């Protein structure tokens, strides 16, 4: 039984990678996915490193209630700096780039054609409260799939 992706990809022109069971926010993952889709791997890695450094924010077009406005986003106002999810996305892109290089493609120039996070479940946790009680304080577990395509193969 192999790993199933949500879309079909031509193995001759694409490289794939997937993050499995990562404790990152699904909402942050969705925002990052929308921001990096369509970019080359080099552009996306540079963008995510700027997000981690706090120089560039990720636009939150969905799940943006109470999210502060950022002046560095063109055409949108709400944005954040999802540090933890950005680090995991960098690992995903590095893995996908290396898979593309192994297939004989130029890894940094490959285009991100598909990136999709999926909620897998929750890891149970407890938060202590007053009078000896405890409340559920669960952590979201996500899978993220990524497909890169060789730009010369689409021409």
For the regions a language model picked out, list residue spans one by one.
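Generic structural signal for short, solvent-exposed loop/turn connectors between secondary structure elements
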Residues: 106-107, 155
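Low-complexity, polar-biased intrinsically disordered regions enriched in Pro/Ser/Thr/Gly
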Residues: 72-78, 124-132
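C-terminal edge-of-domain segments
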Residues: 132-155
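Extended, charged amphipathic interaction segments
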Residues: 107-130
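Ribosome large-subunit tunnel/peptidyl-transferase-proximal elements
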Residues: 2-106, 147-148
């Amino acid at each position: 039984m192999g790993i199933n992706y949500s879309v079909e990809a031509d193995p001759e022109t694409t490289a794939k990678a997937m993050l499995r069971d990562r404790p990152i926010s699904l909402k942050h993952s969705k925002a990052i996915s929308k921001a990096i889709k369509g970019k080359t791997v080099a552009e996306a890695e540079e963008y995510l490193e700027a997000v981690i450094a706090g120089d560039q924010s990720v636009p939150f077009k969905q799940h943006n209630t109470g999210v502060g406005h950022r002046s560095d986003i063109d055409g949108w106002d709400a944005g954040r700096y999802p540090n933890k999810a950005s680090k995991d996305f960098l690992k995903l892109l590095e893995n996908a780039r290396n898979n593309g290089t192994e297939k004989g493609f130029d890894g940094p120039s490959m285009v991100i054609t598909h990136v999709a996070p999926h909620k897998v479940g929750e890891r149970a946790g407890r938060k202590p409260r007053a009078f000896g009680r405890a409340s559920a304080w669960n952590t979201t577990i996500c899978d993220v799939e990524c497909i890169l395509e060789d730009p010369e193969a689409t021409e």
